[in-house]
C-alpha cells in the first residue's frame, strides 16, 4: 500500500495542494494497495449497501510473516526482531506511515456512508518472542518483538464506529491469542 488513498482525510489544505500539483503537472494521482487500498474500503462499502442499519464496521487484517523473505520489510521496516528499546527509537516513521494509511481508510468509509469522523483513537500492543526462532527474513531472538496488534477506532457522527485492525505476527506461534478478530466472540 502506497498511501494517497483518500487525501481528504488529512484536511482540505492537503487535498488542495495535491489537486493543484496534479493540475499543474497535467497528471492524476491514484493511491492503491491491498489493505488498505482495496479490501479495507471496498468490501465494507459494498456490504453496507446491503445493510439497513449500521452501528459498527470492523475490518481486521491478520498477517503472519514467517515465510516472507524480505529482511528489509519484516525486520528493518516492521521492526520484528527488535528490542522494545530499539522499537521506541526506530518506530516513529513506521507508525506514522501505517497510521496514515488506516486513518485514510476510516475517513473514506465514513464519507461513503455519509457520516463525519469526529476523532480517531489508536491502540498498539506489542508481544515479544518467548524463545529464539528463525523466519525467512532472519532471526527473532527471545525477548524481541514477535507480534504487533494495531487498532484505529473512528468515532463518527450518528453514533457509528469504524474500526480498522492490523495484526502482524512473525510466526504462527506468536500471540496465538490474537487469532480471533476484534469484536467477534
Stretches with model-predicted labels:
Residues 15-19, 44-47, 106:
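Short amphipathic alpha-helical segments and helix-helix/interface helices
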Residues 38-50:
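Alpha-helical support elements that line or immediately flank enzyme active sites
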Residues 7, 32-35, 94, 98:
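Glycine- and other small-residue-rich loops at beta-strand/loop junctions that grip anionic moieties
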Residues 2-5, 34-35, 62:
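Short, ordered loop/turn segments at secondary-structure junctions
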